[in-house]
Amino acid sequence: MYTGRFAPSPTGLLHIGSLLTAAASYADARSNGGKWLVRMEDLDPPREMPGAASHILHTLEAFGFEWDGEVAYQSRRYALYEETLCRLQTAGLVYPCHCSRKDWQAAAVHGADGFVYNGRCRNPQQRPALQGKQPAWRIRVPDRDIGFSDGIVGGYAQNLARDIGDFVLLRADGYWAYQLAVVADDAEQGVTHIVRGQDLLVSTPRQIYLQQCLGVPTPQYAHLPLLTNAQGQKWSKQTLAPALDLNRREQLLRQVFRYLKLPEAPETDRPAELLDWAVAHWDMGKVPKHAITTP
């Protein structure tokens, strides 16, 4: 059975880009007779906005979204992440990293998603002294391409050794890394289809590699076009994207429907009816591949 999900982070309030992702993932799930889960990715407390999680859920309800089951909170799932890391440790696929960023980034090269880790701590003889600090944990990556066929973008691949380097699963400050948490959650929740923004396309080969290491199924992925401002920057909390206006729900839904190339919806003042209409007319094949500039 199709199981999709929407996984916002409570570092801020939902904005127009969030609404596009929620609407597309919802329409794809419901049009396939599937479940649609909501998961709160609250992994980084220092960056979270007080009250954002409850505001996000209230906003989704106000826009007519209905999710299946209880909302999952990553902050309550640490035991799952510990078990997942333990499996990788037992298999000898991970190692403790004692490097500070200063230790390795000075001589590092830029890759697909920031600096490429140089593998210094792969060799126990080269690991710097801990000096009472907890290490991070990294996973060894292969020197080969890991690719997949995306439902919107098409074929995409990375050589993890060249483009990413051994990546962190547990940070030295004790916080779980996004890549491990999302793979563990998707597997445990039985997620089969992931519809999300293209800013996460670069993360997908890492997640597929982790799925392979853990022996869990790889979902089908579809990465949506990003909404950008006049300067070409992705609308986000960092670029001061305005929060969704609950007094303009129908107008905003129609706006994201146009971005997703849905036909013009009939007149109604009920957001839930607009979502039902989007489900009935959903066509992933018409979704644009490239970024969309918005007012």
UniProtKB/Swiss-Prot annotation:
GO biological process: glutamyl-tRNA aminoacylation; tRNA modification
Role this protein plays: Catalyzes the tRNA-independent activation of glutamate in presence of ATP and the subsequent transfer of glutamate onto a tRNA(Asp). Glutamate is transferred on the 2-amino-5-(4,5-dihydroxy-2-cyclopenten-1-yl) moiety of the queuosine in the wobble position of the QUC anticodon.
Entry binding sites for ATP: K237
Chain residues that bind L-glutamate: R5, F6, A7, P8, S9, E41, Y178, R196
Organism of derivation: Neisseria meningitidis serogroup C / serotype 2a (strain ATCC 700532 / DSM 15464 / FAM18)
Molecular function (Gene Ontology), one example: zinc ion binding
Pfam families: tRNA-synt_1c (PF00749)
Annotated Gene Ontology cellular component terms: cytosol
Cofactor note: Binds 1 zinc ion per subunit.
Top-level class of the enzyme under EC nomenclature: ligase
Record key words, sorted: Aminoacyl-tRNA synthetase, ATP-binding, Ligase, Metal-binding, Nucleotide-binding, Zinc
Cofactor: Zn(2+)
Residue sites binding Zn(2+) per the record: C97, C99, Y117, C121
EC number in record: 6.1.1.-
InterPro entries tied to this protein: Glu-Q_tRNA(Asp)_Synthase (IPR022380), Glu/Gln-tRNA-synth (IPR000924), Glu/Gln-tRNA-synth_Ib_cat-dom (IPR020058), GluQ/Sye (IPR049940), Rossmann-like_a/b/a_fold (IPR014729)
Protein name: Glutamyl-Q tRNA(Asp) synthetase
Record motif 'HIGH' region, residues: 8-18
Family under the similarity heading: Belongs to the class-I aminoacyl-tRNA synthetase family. GluQ subfamily.
Residue numbers covered by motif 'KMSKS' region: 234-238
